[in-house]
Amino acid sequence: MKNTIPIFFAINEEYIDHCCTSIVSILENNRSLNISIYILTDCISLESKELLQEIENVFTCVTIQWEIIDSESFKQLKKKGGYITEHTLYRYAIADLFPNLDKALYLDADLVINGSIEPLWELDLEGYYCAGVDDIFIRRINYRKILELTEKDVYINAGVLLLNLKDLRKDKIQEKLLQHTSIYINRDQYQDQDAINCICKGKIKLIPNIYNFTTSETLHTPEMLSDIIIIHYTGSIKPWHQEYPWQVLKELYCKYNSSINKIKDRLLSRWMERTIELFQLSQKTNDTELEEGADKLLNKIIDHCSPAVPITYENGLCGIGTGIEYLLQKKLVEGNSDEILHQIDSAVYSVIEQKSLTDLGLRKGVSGLAYYFYLRLCARENFSTPTALKIKEYFSKRGKSFHIF
């Protein structure tokens, strides 16, 4: 039986989807390995926990857990400005938080794994604190002088780190990293990365750039990427941003992101029912925090809806659209239904244009589609013809099977 590979991420709640994309990319390319994922964060929502648990259900080779970190001490060390948050500093604590582990792999959450990580994991770290890839961008701008490093000193990109946790604990490196970050908070431009390179100087092992191929590399052809194991989307513009310039790299990210979206589809009905319950409870209790939470979850669901989501009632577009229409008709949320549901309506129509009714299936496809259209038409003032009333009576009798009524 193969040993388990522990892999760490350090993120905030806003980055969970990107982290999950990274996780899925690992698992799709390393199904024969035993992997334990550890997520270091200051908070995690119920929906994020459910998404991580669903990933566990899909991939049998992985266990996923999260560790809640007290962020206050790290916030004081965060340099003002920039797009990098204090959560990246959580990696300092890995060795001391997990004394049962002697070795681990740390990954930033803005990367994808496009091959086997087993050769990387098996690298010998004897005599080294960590291993990483030479940072090409830093070499180009001659940044070492600012950090008082010589040209012979190694400077790595800290987005991919193979860690010798045993030696990091023994030599109390966490304490030294925190102290360095505090002292040089105004000098060090890349904070935790600078601290790691300075404190671990002389004990950093260089590894091939196939394990941390950054956007500083200038060639982004499919042929160039065929041998790359880890693609790291450095910089403030990411592949999920519309203005991201490198199409080949963006397509690779979208490939793995589509996998996580399919897993997320399995949770849509549960999230919609919870949204309705939260809005109902907030109305009864006048609790604004509950209402804000429900509104945030509703926006999360709407943002996820696209023609790629199944048209089904259960965990699909019709069920989500029906739930939102119900919220509007019960005045649990305010707004124009045509405007709010435009995105879902468009997605539903797009699927209908591409597929026949027989392709959709009766129970999960056509019946859900009919119920969604019925409920949408109920919002119209003139929806009171004899035929319409018969349809209303029919669906009212079947209402319990649609969970909402």
Give, region by region, the residue ranges found by the protein language model.
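Well-ordered alpha-helical scaffold segments within catalytic/enzyme domains
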Residues: 274-287, 321-333, 369-382, 405
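A glycosyltransferase accessory/donor-loop signature
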Residues: 1-11, 21, 163-264
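Internal amphipathic alpha-helical repeat/solenoid segments
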Residues: 226, 262-314
